[in-house]
Amino acid sequence: MAGIQDLKGKTAVVTGGGSGIGKGMCRRFAHQGMNVVVADIEGEAAEKVAIALRTEGARAIALACDVSQRSDIESLAAASIDEFGAVDVACNNAGIFFGGKLREFTEGDWEWTMSVNLMGVVHGSTIFGKHMAERGSGQIVNTASIGGWAPDPNCAPYTTSKFAVVGFSEALRRDLEPDGVGVTILCPGPVATGMAKADRLRPASAGSSNATSLAAEPVMAVGMPPDDVGDLVIDGIRENATYVFTHPDFGAAFEPRFDEMRRALARTPKPRTGDVRPEDLS
C-alpha cells in the first residue's frame, strides 16, 4: 500500500506537539503545507508552537490533551475534525521517561508510564484509526524508541512501554491495511528534547518516586535536532514505511538479541503434533 504522497492541504494531529520531537514534526508538517493540530498536556506550550506556525503562514490550532485519558483523545479528534474536516495523519507521540534501578520504581511509576507511553498510543490509534478506516485513507505514526528494540539498563518501565508500542503498532498495521490506513513506527535514538524532565508533569495519582528523570539529560542534550526527525517521519509517511529509525549505527545494538533468538530456535526440536488427549483441551 502506498503512503500519502502529497501532504499539502492535509491535516496532521501531533500529541506531545508542544516540545521535542512533536514540535519538530509540527514544524516540518507546516512547511509541507499541512494543517497542524498541536496537542500537548501543557496547553501553553502547544499554543506557543501553534502561534509560531501561524506566523509563518500555516493553519494551526493548539489543544490541551492528556493522552492517558481516552476522553481527552476523543475530544481532540472531534475538535480536529470540526476545524479541518478530517484527519489524515495522526502522530501518537506524547511520552515520558525517567530512570532508576528496577527496585526503585514504584507502582505509580509503572502505571503512569504505561498510561502515557502505551495507552496514549492505544487511545490515539483506535480513535483516529476508526476515523481513517471509515474514510479509507490515512497514516498513523506511533512513537516508540530504539529502546523498544534494544533495552538499556535503569529504565525498565520506559523500555517495557516502548516494546509494547512496537508490538501493538505492528498488529495495528496489519489490522488497518485492508482499510487503506497505514501505520508507521517511529524509533528514535537520542534526540535533543526535554523528555528527561518528565517529573514536572507527574500527576498526584502517581504518588512520589525514588527514580529520577535526570539520568538521560546529558544524552538528550547532544541528541539529533527534532526537526530532522520530522523530515524522516515525512519520508516514512510517503513510503508507508513500517519503521522509521533515526540512528542507523544503533542497528548493531539489535544483533545480540537477534543472535540469541537464532541460537534458541536452532536448538529447539520441532514440536510433535497429534496425540492430543481430550484432557489437554479442557
Enumerate the language-model features and the residues they cover.
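Active-site loop immediately N-terminal to the catalytic Tyr-X3-Lys motif
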Residues: 103, 150-156
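Canonical Rossmann dinucleotide-binding motif of NAD(H)/NADP(H)-dependent dehydrogenases/reductases
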Residues: 2-37
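SDR active-site lid
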Residues: 178-248
